[in-house]
Regions:
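Active-site-proximal substrate-binding groove within the catalytic cores of carbohydrate-active enzymes
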Residues: 2-281
Length: 281
């Protein structure tokens, strides 16, 4: 692109109340210090990302795409204290919501990452939703309250199955909370990412995953189809490792996170590390 069309580090970023440009750094999750070897990055001003989003949505419609997604929309929210274009956090929310509505006006679905409450009304799909809490050892059990409120109204998924810490665990958590399955793939071999800062995609090569992906997705889709558009009416733990999620259409999803088979009081067998969907009489 022309020089005037690219990113301008003095014009496009948001500014702190001190008028300094918002330039951020990555920090270690282990020792909490700044990672000097990583490049810094800028936080775009709401006005700048609005212009980019409008242009992208227009072109997406032109090329006949089904939907769009921006990494930070609905997830990251910041004000801009630039004296010449001050934008408050509430105004930034309005700007993002206007963008969501613009995508609908252009017959485009909108997908967001993780997501905040203000974005829920106008988006179609949420990825990387936290399905199983923060895993603090002090917690006994977890209740998928957020998913209970949203299921049947919005589509959502947890972490990418192929990038998760344990594929089976990710699927079990999805079944418990009524989430969809989410995968992240790339065409090239993950070997090209060795000795880079993108090693989290260690298991993203589509050719390596194709058969497993198809099998996992078909099985999950067939099992969960009866409750896909239903609302959740109840969630309970039958023991420390087995949960039961009930839906308004009479179906129940039993999930066994343990390594021993479990039989319910009514005689339903829930195999270890598996889930079943059924109408319990």
């Amino acid at each position: 692109s022309d020089l005037s069309d690219g990113f301008n580090r003095y014009k496009d970023p948001a500014r702190f109340a001190s008028s300094e440009v918002v330039e951020l750094n990555e920090y270690s999750s282990i020792w909490y210090g700044k990672l000097e070897e990583r490049d810094s990055y800028f936080l775009l001003s709401p006005q700048s990302y609005l212009q980019c989003a409008d242009e992208f949505i227009t072109n997406a419609s032109k090329y006949g795409l089904d939907g769009v997604s921006f990494r930070d929309f609905g997830y990251q929210l910041a004000a801009d204290y630039n004296d010449k274009r001050h934008v408050s956090r509430s105004k930034a929310i309005d700007i993002q919501n206007d963008t969501f509505k613009s995508s609908k006006d252009n017959k485009l679905c909108f997908m967001i990452n993780a997501g905040n409450e203000y974005a829920l009304e106008n988006v179609d799909f949420i990825t990387n939703m936290t399905l199983h809490g923060n895993r603090y050892a002090i917690l006994d059990n977890l209740v998928p309250f957020y998913q209970i409120a949203l299921h049947g109204y919005k589509n959502y998924a947890g972490t990418a199955v192929n990038l998760g810490y344990e594929n089976d665990q990710v699927i079990l958590e999805a079944a418990e909370s009524g989430a969809g399955l989410y995968f992240v793939f790339m065409k090239e071999s993950e070997k090209i990412l060795q000795e880079t800062y993108y090693t989290e995609y260690y298991s993203a090569c589509f050719d390596d995953w194709k058969d497993r992906f198809v099998s996992m997705y078909k099985e999950y889709d067939n099992k969960m189809m009866p409750v896909m558009n239903s609302t959740i009416s109840n969630h309970e733990y039958l023991n420390n490792q087995v949960s039961c999620t009930s839906y308004d259409n009479g179906y129940k999803v039993f999930v066994n996170f343990g390594y021993v088979d479990y039989t319910t009081e009514s005689g339903v067998l829930v195999p270890a590390r598996d889930y079943i969907v059924m109408v319990e009489e």
